[in-house]
Design a protein with these regions (language model features):
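Anionic group-transfer/hydrolysis microenvironments
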Residues: 4, 63, 130
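NTP-dependent small-molecule kinase module
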Residues: 72, 76, 93, 97, ...
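Conserved nucleotide-sensing/catalytic segment adjacent to the nucleotide-binding pocket
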Residues: 1-58
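Conserved protein kinase catalytic core
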Residues: 6-8, 67-68, 87, 134-136
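Conserved catalytic-core segment of NTP-binding enzymes
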Residues: 80-116, 123
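Amphipathic alpha-helical transducer elements in NTP-driven molecular machines
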Residues: 17-21, 60, 81, 100-103
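ATP-dependent NMP and nucleoside kinases share a basic, alpha-helical "lid"
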Residues: 46-94
Length: 146
């Protein structure tokens, strides 16, 4: 979703989900190539063209991936549970401390989005994003019943 969003303020806007439907979902359903120009967060504009030729499987990841535009077409929906502090720490480690204020605002917006879209309740599988028992992800997975 980060490549579809268009900046912090427009990330969960109706335009985002319209673009998502037109650029990703519609071509996928029509067995066509997916084409869009991804958003560059540092330049604050769309820059690099992306082409995915007729994918048989597509994983869409991110906060907005639980929107109805995607959800109704998804064959499997995952919910990853992670403590807010751990989540923001991971993002700041990846993207830098300079986005800390935007991330605090984003967490409020994503929480509202999750509630409005019943994201957690509509998921097929829940995954612990910070398990107490560490696993070797190269050879193990954990399955639980909700």
């Amino acid at each position: 979703m980060d490549e579809i969003y268009e900046g912090w303020e427009n990330a969960l806007s109706p335009k985002t989900f319209s673009d998502l439907a037109n650029w990703i979902i519609k071509p996928l359903l029509e067995s066509k190539s997916i084409e869009f120009t991804k958003y560059d967060w540092y330049l604050e504009k769309r820059k690099e063209r992306v082409v995915i030729n007729n994918p048989k499987v597509l994983i869409i990841e991110g906060v907005g991936s639980s929107s109805s535009e995607i959800s109704e077409h998804a064959c499997l929906k995952l919910w990853i549970v992670v403590n807010k502090e751990i989540g923001i720490s991971r993002v700041l480690t990846r993207d830098g401390q300079q986005i800390q204020e935007q991330m605090k605002k984003w967490q409020t917006r994503e929480y509202k989005f999750f509630i409005e879209n019943n994201s957690k309740e509509n998921s097929d599988i829940w995954i612990d994003g910070d398990p107490v028992v560490k696993i070797d992800t190269s050879s193990q997975f954990v399955r639980t019943n909700r």
